[in-house]
């Protein structure tokens, strides 16, 4: 199946909220939660996508003609390209009843591994969600990053014990998850964390720890102070706070501040290999992509993941070659027009 055929098939089964748009840009689903949309009037999601599109790349083909290498070492695991499936949860609430969270992860995690990347897995108020994710990760050699919500410390410890048994190569927390409307006043309680609390969580993890939901230099420095080995520059796809900057806008300053000291990932509106290139040029080491993987799996299961990863890789390779970059280390900010 082609990418377009998979998108069309997904429209028949992805549920009442997501429209499986040809371009996933937040316009058709703004202010749709439950669903794939963003909080408030939806500008967070829309701005995320638009700001990547506003960036232009500098073409330069007066360079050596040799193969392009997109491989990336991620906490000791080599991946084929610096792209990861973002953590998603409560699928039946947001995307219809075709897949439970467990069924989705049972397709996503091995399909990502087979195609040379890795998946971050999601969390939710139902404890079976993380239990299922841990089981899938264990069955696939720990090839993935379980992502825990910022619950109270007792619940975090329970979930850390659960996922550590799966031996993942890293563990994450989407610390901005407390802003999700459907988590408000829920049990277990979720909320922000101090540097001291985060330091305690990092120590309990006993794995490289990634803090997802960083949008300022100050936040990045606090994550570093707490001992995190990586961050994800992210506004949760616009789902936790409306009218904030896009991840593309804040990424360069954050990368300049902490990029030499920790791994920097970014998400939010990244859809193509060209977008991946732009993110790397602005200082990211890798990217997370969320909503499009939903459509690929709902449209064609594991085949959808394969088609999308191959599309991203081909687009990234083409952009690198046309800009004179033959490895990820060759990608420089000067390859973005105006920088």
Give residue spans per PLM region:
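N-terminal functional module of multi-domain proteins
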Residues: 44-130
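Long, hydrophobic, well-ordered secondary-structure blocks that form the structural core
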Residues: 118, 129-155
């Amino acid at each position: 199946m082609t990418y377009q055929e998979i998108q069309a098939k997904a429209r028949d089964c992805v549920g009442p909220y997501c429209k499986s748009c040809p371009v996933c840009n937040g316009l058709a689903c703004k202010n749709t939660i439950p669903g794939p949309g963003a909080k408030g009037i939806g500008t967070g999601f829309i701005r995320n996508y638009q700001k990547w599109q506003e960036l232009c790349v500098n073409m330069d083909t007066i360079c050596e003609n040799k193969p392009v290498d997109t491989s990336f070492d991620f906490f000791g695991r080599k991946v084929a390209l610096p792209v990861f499936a973002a953590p998603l949860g409560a699928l039946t609430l947001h995307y219809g009843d075709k897949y439970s969270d467990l069924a989705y992860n049972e397709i996503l995690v091995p399909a990502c591994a087979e195609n040379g990347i890795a998946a971050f897995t999601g969390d939710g108020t139902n404890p079976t969600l993380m239990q299922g994710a841990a089981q899938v990760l264990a069955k696939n050699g720990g090839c993935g990053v379980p992502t825990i919500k910022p619950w109270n410390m007792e619940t975090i410890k329970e979930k850390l014990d659960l996922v550590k048994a799966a031996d993942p190569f890293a563990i994450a927390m989407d610390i901005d998850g407390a802003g999700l409307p459907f988590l408000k006043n829920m049990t277990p309680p979720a909320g922000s964390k101090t540097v001291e609390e985060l330091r305690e969580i990092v120590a309990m993890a006993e794995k490289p720890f990634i803090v997802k939901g960083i949008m300022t230099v100050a936040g990045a420095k606090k994550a570093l102070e707490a001992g995190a080995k990586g961050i994800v520059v992210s506004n949760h796809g616009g789902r936790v706070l409306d009218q904030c900057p896009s991840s593309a806008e804040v990424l360069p300053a954050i990368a300049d501040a902490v990029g030499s000291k920790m791994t920097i990932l970014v998400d939010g509106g990244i859809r193509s290999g060209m977008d991946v290139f732009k993110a790397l040029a602005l200082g990211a080491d890798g990217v997370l992509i969320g909503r499009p993987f939903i459509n690929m799996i709902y449209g064609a299961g594991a085949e959808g993941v394969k088609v999308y990863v191959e599309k991203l890789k081909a687009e990234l390779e083409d952009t690198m070659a046309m800009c004179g970059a033959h490895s990820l280390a060759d990608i420089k900010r000067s390859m973005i027009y105006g920088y």
